[in-house]
């Protein structure tokens, strides 16, 4: 049984968690995901949110980083009940279960090193199998990728 349930990008419980995430652009906004294909997951204890995003392949729009895969745009875990790396793996399973094409670049995320309180930024993603693949265009974030088999 998964710790996650699907919700929409307008889910107020998820938006409240997003308000406390370092990537939040506008605190209090009713939504927190970019346009395109999304899968938003809320933990069963409502203490964690995970958001997958990909430009809709039918739109012709490409991701600014040139990668073709699903990007975790937000992951906030305030839960003590679940290990973050296990939650990431379950979020990947949920995405596959939806039947989406994962894309040749697999699973993608960025971690803003200076905004996380960790000596090893992205550690939970690394435990879930992600590897460092460079930096964001502005140089502020570490790019982590996990190929999809």
Indicate residue ranges for each PLM-predicted region:
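Non-catalytic substrate-recognition and accessory regions of acyl/acetyltransferase enzymes
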Residues: 1-115, 119, 123-149
